[in-house]
Amino acid sequence: LTEIATRFRTIIDQHGAEAIMPYVSAGNQSLLSIMFGDRFWHHLGASRVTGALCGATAGAGAATTNGTGKGIDPSDLVHSKLIILWGTNTRLTNRHLWPVIEEARAAGAQVIVIDPLRTITAESADWFLQPLPGTDVALMLAMMHVLIRDDLVDQEWVAAHTVGFEDLAAHVADWTPARAAAATGLSVAD
């Protein structure tokens, strides 16, 4: 802390407090995460950006998926039957969420980890899929293909809450598990 404080003081003395640009991450998109240091940075007089650097994209995706750009309440995961952790080492980087996942698991939820890296989270999964790096989209397309082909989609819900499902179904029609397996390095059974 002394080293950081000394460096801050040197920068402020030489260039002004605006020369310090804090980087902020929203973590699991919670307001607590994104606003944690606001009072300190304001008091210091540091430069500020609105939101996190990736916030606009994450917020738009969350709003489209969940109906709100603020993310979902992580405690709702305890009611899940299936939790898919895709490209995230949750046990290491989102430690406050892992106990909620364990609670869901104790209630019967299955945890699938999809990640090109074998992480501590992957080691804890009920099922670990390790696609080749950069092949996530092929796997996603094949998963959608199977959901539609095997009539695992709630058509009534889709009709009431989505737009363009028919276009999506047409787009994924050629993304068979065999095609995805060739791209991802996974087996067709996976």
Residue ranges and their predicted role:
Residues L1-D190:
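Cofactor-pocket helix-loop regions in the catalytic cores of large enzyme subunits
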